[in-house]
Design a protein with these regions (language model features):
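Short helix-coil junctions and helix-kink-helix linkers
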Residues: 27-38
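Residues that form generic nucleotide/phosphate-binding pockets
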Residues: 11, 29, 44
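Long, charged, low-complexity intrinsically disordered regions
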Residues: 1, 36, 76-78
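Positively charged, polyanion-binding regions of nucleic-acid-associated proteins
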Residues: 1-20, 40
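Short, cationic-aromatic polyanion-contact patches
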Residues: 59-78
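Charge-enriched amphipathic alpha-helical scaffolds
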Residues: 36-57
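Short acidic, hydrophobic short linear motifs in intrinsically disordered regions
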Residues: 18-29
Length: 78
């Protein structure tokens, strides 16, 4: 399995600044068994949020913590 933290940052870097990604995109990028990779992705996302490197949202609204469905974006994006 590839590092999920690096995969999040790499996928975001390939998108427009205001784009978001789905956590399952990250899991699919790092492991053939993407569902099995989801816990590692969630943990990596929690760390990236804590470090201020990404932000979370759902349906265009910011989320302060990961709970339920979410999208991952660059910090400061609306």
């Amino acid at each position: 399995m590839t590092d999920p933290r690096a995969a999040v940052l790499s996928l975001l870097a390939r998108r427009t600044p205001d784009a978001t990604i789905c956590p399952s995109e990250v899991a699919r990028a790092i492991a053939p068994d993407w569902r099995g990779a989801m816990p590692a992705v969630h943990t990596a996302v929690d760390g990236l949020v804590r470090d201020g490197l990404v932000r979370l949202s759902w349906k265009g609204r910011p989320l302060s913590t990961r709970s339920g469905p979410y999208r991952i974006g660059r910090p400061g994006d609306v």
